[in-house]
């Protein structure tokens, strides 16, 4: 009877719980007549009105209710509401999860009032200090009275296990953690005031110690892993069950996380002598060993921690308790229970800690003695404590193993006592972790599932997720099937897996002896293995590089859905590392085929501790088929596509490298091959296993129909609960089966004892057969419950398309026909070696002779031999053109056959030069390739000449493919044949990274149609040549030998292709002569590159008036500026990549043919292929040139000459972009050329310098004479003091700003004139940058003018003056470092002035002077760099104003003297109206007091000095040195905390200005711009310079600084100069468009006119299309952002009906737009609220501009004669631009078509760019965003070939601006 009553009570309770969960349904259904409805939820009355749920007061609303509602709620208990009403705190705890699931929540900030101790909400008038101490909570707001608001926060109640039955089973036995007090005794670890000052060092430099700990652990682990093989250190497979390794395999990411967790404890060890908690150690007796902390700090430098021997000895001594060192380790282990702050985030394990929020680190408080002690507000959680102990154990084992002879101290039985104590601690913490599970599991019998933290998880959830992943797998398979005849999954399963003739009987791990290097692939007979690889389809007749890449990418993508299919199919879940390491071969193999059931079985061990025996899990038949198919078909395709040269994987400790005698000699290629043939789940692009970040992306989207998604840990707990309660195991009868299920999930090692009453049950307690049977039964139960087998037979249609079958059968014959076509010999006239000689005499005359035998041999090889493909590398100037020119003339002389050949060059500027050279003497008929593409073959032309873009164009490819048919129809003969395909400078295919996407179309070209392919270059060593040929789809260079297996695989890959290798002729190596020895090469460091270049050019033209020169500049802007400024001296031609093709050809031709043209200025595109006879000088101003660009540039000097490499002094070293060659280095140029070509080095030997470093022995007599004449002219100019005209002001401005940038915090340019002065011209003589002598002169570094004289930075000697930059002394003067002072003059930049003399930065003493850099003051002088003032003059490094003189660092002019070392203009003699004076507050007058130690005050002072302008409205661009007009267009508006990704500078409970604890705050009074804000902006600057992948890697690199914005700013400021240069370089085009308003014309974009109809439209047509698109969107109520993101035409009526921004954003959020945006695009690299906030306040100026233009749009519509339609309002317009910005496909297409723009990576820059105007084809102006919409529409249009998927790839975003 009692049992029945108990069951009845249980049922009633369950029913009540279900009714409570259905309350939300009543909220929608139970409505009153007034549109309102009320419902009671856990003590609160909830009102629903207009889809809004709010908590209301019953007493207030009861008179407004219907009578029935009022009666219903009158008896309700509103105790919870009354409790909230009476609570004095603003924040009130609420235990109702249903309430929080029903009512919208918000995030609010709260603080603890110091006076009352109450928790109050942060309001507008809350003080600054209270705001800094605030913390954030997720709350529900409640209006408890008039203007009285409370906030509810969810706090879960303790479940009452004593109060009778409860409707659900909670997994929270207890919540209070006393372990840190009882076991670790943390309350006895007290810190005094001195300790706190020491600990502040850690928090001030946490990033440093994070990096230090990681590097130390990494180094120790490397040494420990390299110990000789023994059972204690090296893991072997036979050691799998019987023992565990001491030094375990760790991935690098794990080592990094361990290192970050160890940072606080490494700090404690390094300061063991200073902290009072180590008092026991500090009281050691004389003679006992002490820790030399200074030596440790030196040895453990984080940049290179190689010296770890001493550290290892200390660790060994601590483990052995030598002297009192054991006390140190004892204290450190106890300190592990202290929470020193959040550890690193990321990875699978970190998801387990996501429920732990608002953790507070150790906070100091004052005890009764006035000492600061550690008050533990929140100790480490058990899970985090366990991770910390994991890290400590790893460090102790690795460090001790570095020097210990053996590792017996870690033995479980005979080890030292310290190790045993550590294991006890770890065991207790692990047990506590198991009990502290924070996930609430509730049974939901009605839906056959459970509720995990209020989220429903049942059978339908699992099946929906599983089949969504299966569908994704099938979709990717279909993409491969479009290119190949792919066998289906069912085909392979039926043919092999289900075929009983194929046996899979083999021993499995943990059962029988393991056989190394086995795989179930070896069990498959050879006859089956030969037919599994798919064949190419007929329309895809080439296995090009692009197709190979498509194969590898597709297989990488379908790996992730397969992982999820396995995860759900096994049922008893894996932790992610176990799933990640599944392997089908090798020593870590765990994937097998069961010979009986023909299902895949997985034998895995518990990866987390490696101590348990293997677990057997069996997959269902459907999943088994997919896994088998992946291994046998897809992985083998991937291996073939990657090729034998694939080497992306590095050796990682988690790999077991077997089969090599010396594992240290294993190359990356060997490792990659092992990984590909062993592990299942790989990311071949990155060279790593599939990362957890990639894996978990599916959880955010799938299953589609689930209202709430579970994270990975919740899903794991849910799967365990399903297996426990829903799969059908009964505790009474299936005792061992239930226990087996728990162990298969690795859920608890004590499950048998605690739950099932079995004493320490494990699978080893039963026989091996029984263990296998129990596990197979468990898997069978899960498979039956999930129902995957029922879908097995209908999951994949076994029938194939009849056409595919026929085509597949015919593929073999097609293949042989293709090969026969390629290998057949062409009918042609007999050739003779005499043909080449005759051709040479036609071209050069009867006296023609070859240069050497190499040239003769190569001409005969090209003309006579049957080699189908030839590559030639010859030095520049060798005569490579003749190598194909003579054979072409010989071919043209054949009468019976007409040969048509093609020549392609890299740049348009070479076209004119090539056509002139090749058409001379009338030997060949030459025409542009464009004629052939547009009109076809004319029957007359022998050679068509074009550029690489023509070679890659689809029209050219189609013309060649249809050649035979067209020729036969046009000329009625087959005697018109394709001759040579010649590609000049073919190294560009590999080295021009930013253009590689343009070359993709070349892979579609049928090379086999040509008689011969010839590739020429002067800079293509074997490695570059081989890679370049493979990039365009060819086989590559011929190898000396080929293995038979490799040959067979090559044939498989190249079905239907020509696999001829290219023969390489390397004339440079054959001749063994270093190229360019005939040119004199000089590297000069100068103050101003343009100024020095102008001097050199003027000198050259004075000596050789008829000569020519080439100047290579770095940017297009510089090209134009040089051309404008030099035009007054000589005739100039300038070229860069932004010119149209016709203009480039015209200008090049003009420079070559017009003898009056002197200088050709351009970017690096002018350095290749141009042949100019009168050229005598090449000057390079681009310090980013690589060795190839240098050789090409110098190679223009055919007969000798001078080459100058000019770089600016103190310039930052250029950094090579990803995939590019590094820039040339300072030093011997010839040695770098030798290294590039692979020639023997002569460094330090005779003959090292050839034409460089002052050597003239190898130069021609003419070149030597030219050098001597240039030298004599320079000496003559110096002697005669010839004045050279200054450069334009633009150069002076830029150079002066560059010089001042390192001294000034701002680059504000100001030209101020003061009474009695003139700029750059005075009554006296002025000498600039020359050695001049005058009577009375003053040297200054800026443009300062006085009545008496002007001094420049050179060595000028006068009677009454001072020499600068030298140690010269005059009658009444003093030498200073940069400025000289005389009786009537004062020098700038050092600011020390006296009546008779000045000493600055020297130790010179005069009669009436004081030395600078001190605080000394004399009667008539004051020293600089201090704030001292005297009667006569004032010199200081701050802004000082006196009667006699004033200091200034800008262009100031005075009557007598001016001194400058500060940034403001000078005020002299009351002439304030001519100057702008900016007063600066004296910091000494406004001193303030802040709490904190001296260490904090010192750090605060250092930071203030490093970032001095944070008291103003400073931004990071000012800090970098940009001018105000540049900042106006580059300014990073919209950058706030939400720009930062989650976890980066977003910690709570710390100072909001510096992210440090309040007691360690380094912010200072009056600081307007916080360090945290500057860190946000610095991060945005880094984003400006990186694409998505590079930025993601950068975020990983700065992980140590994620919680330390101050440390990050220090790290950022180190490379400020480099960043400044990069922005100037990469955004020069952007500033030209937005700042100077340069016009963008679509007609200047060659690719745009060729590849898009939009670029041929008029402005009217573009506008009509724009309005039509918006009209359609408005009519269909399409969601705008989603449409422009990926052309998805989803409906969202609420968006179009929204009246304000808030409602608009809510509508987007409701349909999940922002969620999809973050998961699908680069928006995921920002914070979760970043895109949403763009609709609020960030774009006010742009919004007002747009709204003002709405009237203009209406006028345009009326002018166009269309019906006026509503132009999109601002929010819709902004949605469009955001969608376009995140649409990667569209952006790549636009950037490819519109050549004047490049990629931008910040949304504000994109919005500004979208609003500039462009010239349409009819020269009418339209906004760029209209053109964007037109291109977007074209990509989605049906009349575009292949629709949206045939997208032309774009250039690399980091490309050079010039071309």
UniProtKB/Swiss-Prot annotation:
Gene (UniProt): YRF1-6
InterPro entries: DEAD/DEAH_box_helicase_dom (IPR011545), Helicase_ATP-bd (IPR014001), Helicase_C-like (IPR001650), ORC1-binding_dom (IPR037240), P-loop_NTPase (IPR027417), Sir1_ORC-binding (IPR021646), Y'_ATP-dependent_helicase (IPR050978)
Residues reported in the UniProt entry to bind ATP: 874-881
Species this protein is from: Saccharomyces cerevisiae (strain ATCC 204508 / S288c) (Baker's yeast)
Stretches assigned to the Helicase C-terminal domain: 1095-1244
UniProt keyword Lipid metabolism, yes or no: no
GO-annotated molecular function: ATP binding; ATP hydrolysis activity; DNA helicase activity; nucleic acid binding
GO BP, one annotated term: telomere maintenance via recombination
Pfam families in the record: DEAD, Helicase_C, Sir1
EC top class, as a word: isomerase
Comp. bias (Low complexity): 1318-1461
Matches recorded under PANTHER family: PTHR31583, PTHR31583:SF2
Known function: Catalyzes DNA unwinding and is involved in telomerase-independent telomere maintenance.
Composition bias, Basic and acidic residues: 1462-1485
Gene3D superfamilies per record: P-loop containing nucleotide triphosphate hydrolases
EC number(s) reported in the record: 5.6.2.-
Induction notes from the record: Induced in absence of telomerase TLC1.
Taxonomic path: Eukaryota, Fungi, Dikarya, Ascomycota, Saccharomycotina
A GO term from the CC aspect: nucleus
Protein name, as recorded: Y' element ATP-dependent helicase protein 1 copy 6
PROSITE patterns membership: HELICASE_ATP_BIND_1, HELICASE_CTER
Domain Helicase ATP-binding as annotated: residue spans: 861-1038
Keywords: ATP-binding, Helicase, Hydrolase, Isomerase, Nucleotide-binding, Repeat
Chain intervals for the UniProt region annotation (Disordered): 1318-1485
Keyword Hydrolase recorded: yes
Family to which this protein belongs: Belongs to the helicase family. Yeast subtelomeric Y' repeat subfamily.
């Amino acid at each position: 009877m009692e049992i029945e009553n108990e069951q009845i009570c249980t049922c009633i309770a369950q029913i009540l719980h279900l009714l409570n969960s259905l309350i939300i349904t009543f909220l929608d259904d139970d409505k009153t007549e007034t549109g309102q409805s009320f419902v009671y939820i856990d003590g609160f009355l909830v009102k629903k009105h207009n889809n809004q749920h709010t908590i209301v007061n019953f007493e207030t609303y009861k008179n407004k209710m219907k009578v029935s509602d009022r009666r219903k709620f009158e008896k309700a208990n509103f105790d919870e509401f009354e409790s909230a009403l009476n609570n004095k705190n603003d924040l009130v705890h609420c235990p109702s999860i249903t309430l929080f699931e029903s009512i919208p929540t918000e995030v609010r900030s709260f603080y603890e009032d110091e006076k009352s101790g109450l928790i109050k909400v942060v309001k507008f008038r809350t003080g600054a200090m209270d705001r800094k101490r605030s913390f954030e909570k997720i709350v529900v707001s409640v209006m408890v009275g008039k203007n009285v608001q409370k906030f509810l926060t969810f706090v879960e109640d303790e479940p009452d296990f004593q109060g009778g039955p409860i409707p659900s089973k909670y997994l929270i036995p207890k919540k209070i953690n006393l372990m840190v007090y009882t076991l670790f005794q943390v309350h006895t670890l007290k810190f005094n005031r001195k300790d706190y000052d020491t600990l502040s060092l850690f928090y001030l430099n946490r990033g440093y110690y994070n990096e230090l700990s990681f590097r130390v652990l990494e180094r120790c682990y490397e040494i420990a892993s390299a110990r000789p093989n023994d059972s204690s250190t090296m893991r072997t497979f036979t050691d799998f069950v019987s023992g565990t390794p001491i030094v375990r395999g760790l991935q690098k990411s794990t080592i990094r996380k361990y290192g970050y967790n160890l940072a606080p404890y490494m700090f404690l060890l390094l300061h063991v002598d200073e902290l009072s908690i180590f008092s026991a150690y500090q009281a050691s007796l004389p003679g006992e060993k002490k820790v030399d902390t200074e030596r440790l700090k030196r040895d453990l430098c984080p940049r290179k921690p190689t010296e770890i021997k001493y550290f290892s000895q200390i660790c060994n001594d601590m483990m052995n308790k030598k002297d009192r060192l054991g006390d140190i380790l004892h204290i450190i282990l106890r300190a592990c229970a202290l929470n020193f702050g959040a550890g690193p985030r990321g990875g699978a394990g970190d998801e387990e800690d996501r429920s732990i929020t608002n953790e507070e680190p150790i906070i100091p408080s004052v005890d009764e003695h006035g000492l600061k002690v550690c008050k533990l507000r929140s100790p480490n959680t058990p899970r985090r404590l366990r991770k910390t102990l994991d890290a400590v154990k790893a460090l102790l084992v690795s460090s001790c193993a570095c020097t210990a002879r053996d590792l017996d101290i870690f033995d479980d039985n005979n080890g030292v006592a310290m190790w045993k104590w550590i294991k006890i601690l770890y065991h207790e913490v692990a047990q506590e972790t198991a009990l502290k599970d924070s996930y609430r599991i509730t049974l939901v019998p009605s839906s056959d599932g459970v509720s995990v933290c209020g989220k429903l998880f049942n059978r339908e959830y699992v099946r929906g997720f599983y089949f969504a992943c299966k569908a994704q797998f099938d979709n990717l398979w279909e993409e491969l099937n479009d290119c190949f005849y792919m066998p289906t999954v069912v085909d392979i399963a039926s043919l092999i897996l289900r075929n009983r003739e194929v046996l899979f009987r083999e021993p499995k791990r943990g059962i029988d002896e393991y056989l190394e290097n086995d795989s179930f692939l070896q069990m498959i007979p050879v006859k089956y293995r030969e037919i599994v690889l798919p064949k190419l389809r007929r329309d895809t007749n080439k296995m090009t590089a692009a197709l190979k890449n498509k194969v590898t990418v597709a297989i990488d993508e379908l790996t992730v859905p397969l992982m999820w299919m396995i995860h759900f199919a096994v049922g008893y879940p894996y932790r992610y590392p176990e799933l990640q390491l599944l392997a089908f071969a090798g020593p870590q193999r765990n994937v097998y085929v069961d010979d009986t059931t023909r299902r895949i079985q997985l034998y895995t061990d518990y990866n987390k501790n490696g101590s348990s025996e293997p677990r057997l899990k069996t997959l269902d038949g459907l999943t088994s088929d997919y896994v088998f198919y992946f291994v046998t078909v897809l992985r083998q395709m991937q291996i073939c596509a990657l090729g034998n040269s694939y080497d992306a994987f590095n050796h990682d400790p988690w790999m077991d490298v077997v089969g090599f005698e010396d594992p240290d000699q294993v190359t990356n290629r060997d490792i990659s091959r092992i990984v590909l043939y062993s592990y299942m789940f790989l990311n071949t692009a990155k060279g790593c296993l599939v990362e957890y970040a990639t894996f978990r992306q599916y959880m955010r989207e799938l299953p589609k129909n689930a209202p709430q998604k579970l994270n990975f840990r919740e899903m794991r707990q849910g799967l365990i609960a399903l297996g426990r309660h829903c799969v059908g195991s009964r505790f009474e009868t299936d005792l061992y089966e239930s226990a087996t299920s728990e162990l298969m999930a690795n859920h608890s090692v004590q499950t048998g004892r605690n739950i099932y009453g079995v004493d320490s049950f494990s699978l080893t307690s039963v026989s091996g057969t029984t263990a296998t049977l129990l596990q197979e039964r468990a898997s069978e139960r899960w498979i039956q419950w999930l129902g995957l087998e029922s879908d097995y037979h209908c999951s994949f249609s076994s029938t194939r398309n009849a056409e595919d079958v026929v085509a597949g059968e015919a593929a073999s014959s097609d293949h042989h026909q293709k090969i026969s076509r390629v290998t057949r010999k062409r009918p042609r006239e007999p050739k003779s070696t005499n043909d080449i000689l005759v051709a040479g005499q036609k071209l050069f005359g009867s006296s023609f002779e070859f240069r050497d035998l190499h040239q003769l041999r190569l001409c005969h090889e090209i003309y006579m031999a049957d080699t189908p493909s030839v590559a030639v590398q010859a030095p520049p100037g060798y005569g490579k053109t003749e190598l194909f020119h003579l054979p072409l003339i010989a071919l043209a002389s054949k009468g019976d056959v007409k040969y048509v050949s093609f020549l392609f060059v890299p740049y348009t500027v070479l076209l004119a030069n090539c056509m002139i050279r090749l058409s001379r003497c009338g030997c060949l008929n030459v025409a542009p390739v464009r004629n052939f593409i547009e009109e076809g073959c004319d029957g007359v032309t022998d050679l068509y000449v074009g550029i690489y873009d023509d070679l890659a164009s689809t029209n050219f490819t189609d013309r060649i493919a249809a050649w035979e048919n067209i020729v036969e129809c046009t000329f009625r003969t087959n005697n018109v044949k394709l001759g040579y395909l010649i590609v000049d400078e073919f190294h560009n295919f590999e080295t021009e990274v930013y253009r590689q996407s343009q070359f993709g179309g070349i892979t579609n070209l049928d090379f086999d149609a040509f008689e011969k392919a010839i590739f020429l270059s002067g800079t293509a060593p074997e490695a570059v040549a081989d890679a370049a040929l493979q990039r365009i789809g060819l086989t590559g260079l011929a190898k000396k030998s080929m293995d038979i297996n490799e040959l067979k695989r090559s044939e498989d890959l190249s079905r239907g292709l020509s696999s001829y290798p290219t023969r390489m002729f390397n004339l440079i190596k054959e001749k063994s002569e270093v190229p360019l020895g005939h040119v004199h090469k000089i590297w000069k460091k100068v103050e101003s590159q343009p100024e020095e270049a102008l001097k050199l050019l003027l000198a050259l033209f004075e000596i050789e008036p008829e000569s020519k020169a080439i100047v290579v500049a770095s940017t297009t802007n510089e090209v134009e500026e040089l051309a404008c400024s030099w035009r007054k001296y000589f005739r100039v031609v300038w070229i860069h990549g932004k010119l149209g093709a016709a203009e480039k050809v015209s200008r090049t031709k003009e420079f070559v043919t017009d003898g009056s043209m002197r200088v050709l200025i351009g970017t690096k595109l002018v350095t290749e292929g141009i042949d100019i006879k009168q050229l005598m000088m090449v000057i390079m101003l681009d310090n980013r040139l690589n060795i190839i660009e240098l050789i090409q540039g110098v190679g223009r000097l055919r007969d000798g000459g001078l080459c100058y490499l000019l770089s600016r002094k103190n310039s930052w070293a250029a950094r090579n972009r990803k995939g590019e060659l590094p820039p040339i280095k300072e030093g011997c140029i010839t040695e770098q050329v030798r290294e590039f070509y692979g020639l023997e080095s002569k460094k330090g030997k005779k003959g090292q310098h050839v034409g460089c470093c002052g050597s003239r022995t190898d130069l021609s007599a003419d070149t030597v004479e030219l050098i001597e004449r240039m030298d004599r002219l320079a000496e003559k100019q110096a002697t005669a003091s010839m004045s050279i005209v200054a450069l334009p002001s633009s150069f002076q401005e830029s150079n002066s700003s560059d010089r001042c940038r390192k001294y000034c915090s701002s680059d504000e340019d100001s030209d101020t004139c003061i009474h009695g002065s003139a700029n750059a011209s005075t009554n006296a003589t002025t000498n600039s940058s020359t050695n001049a002598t005058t009577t009375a002169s003053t040297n200054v570094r800026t443009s300062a003018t006085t009545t008496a004289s002007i001094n420049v930075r050179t060595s000028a000697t006068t009677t009454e003056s001072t020499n600068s930059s030298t140690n010269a002394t005059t009658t009444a003067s003093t030498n200073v470092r940069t400025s000289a002072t005389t009786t009537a003059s004062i020098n700038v930049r050092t600011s020390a002035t006296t009546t008779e003399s000045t000493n600055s930065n020297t130790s010179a003493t005069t009669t009436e002077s004081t030395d600078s850099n001190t605080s000394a003051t004399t009667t008539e002088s004051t020293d600089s760099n201090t704030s001292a003032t005297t009667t006569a003059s004032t010199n200081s490094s701050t802004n000082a104003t006196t009667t006699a003189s004033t200091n200034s660092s800008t262009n100031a002019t005075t009557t007598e003297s001016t001194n400058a070392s500060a940034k403001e203009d000078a005020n002299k003699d009351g002439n304030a109206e001519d100057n702008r004076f900016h007063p600066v507050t004296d910091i000494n007058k406004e001193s303030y007091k802040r709490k904190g130690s001296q260490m904090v005050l010192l750090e605060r002072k250092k930071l203030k000095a490093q970032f001095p302008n944070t008291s103003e409205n400073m931004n990071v661009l000012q800090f970098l040195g940009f001018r105000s007009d540049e900042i106006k267009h580059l300014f990073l508006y919209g950058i706030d905390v939400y720009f930062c990704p989650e976890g980066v500078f977003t910690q709570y409970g710390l100072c909001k200005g510096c992210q440090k604890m309040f007691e360690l705050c380094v912010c200072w009074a009056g600081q307007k711009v916080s360090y945290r804000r500057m860190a946000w902006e610095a991060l945005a600057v880094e984003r400006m310079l990186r694409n998505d992948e590079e930025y993601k890697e950068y975020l990983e690199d700065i992980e140590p600084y994620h919680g330390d914005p101050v440390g990050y700013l220090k790290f950022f400021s180190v490379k400020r100069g480099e960043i400044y240069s990069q922005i100037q370089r990469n955004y020069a085009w952007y500033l030209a468009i937005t700042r100077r308003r340069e016009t963008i014309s679509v007609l200047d974009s060659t690719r745009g006119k060729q590849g898009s109809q939009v670029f041929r439209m008029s402005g009217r047509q573009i506008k009509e299309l724009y309005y039509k698109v918006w009209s359609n969107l408005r009519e269909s109520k399409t969601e705008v952002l989603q449409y422009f993101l990926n052309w998805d035409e989803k409906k969202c009526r609420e968006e179009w009906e929204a009246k304000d921004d808030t409602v608009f954003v809510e509508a987007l959020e409701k349909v999940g737009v922002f969620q999809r945006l973050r998961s699908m695009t680069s928006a995921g690299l920002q914070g979760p609220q970043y895109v949403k906030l763009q609709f609020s306040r960030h774009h006010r100026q742009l919004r007002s501009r747009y709204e003002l233009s709405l009237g203009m749009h209406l006028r345009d519509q009326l002018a166009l004669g269309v019906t006026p339609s509503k132009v999109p309002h601002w929010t819709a317009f902004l949605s469009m631009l955001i969608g376009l910005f995140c649409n990667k496909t569209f952006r790549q297409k636009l950037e490819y078509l519109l050549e004047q723009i490049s990629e931008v990576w910040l949304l504000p820059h994109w919005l500004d760019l979208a609003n500039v105007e462009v010239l349409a084809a009819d020269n009418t102006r339209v906004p760029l965003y209209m053109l964007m919409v037109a291109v977007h529409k074209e990509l989605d249009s049906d009349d575009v070939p292949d629709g949206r998927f045939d997208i032309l790839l774009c250039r690399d975003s980091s490309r050079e601006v010039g071309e």
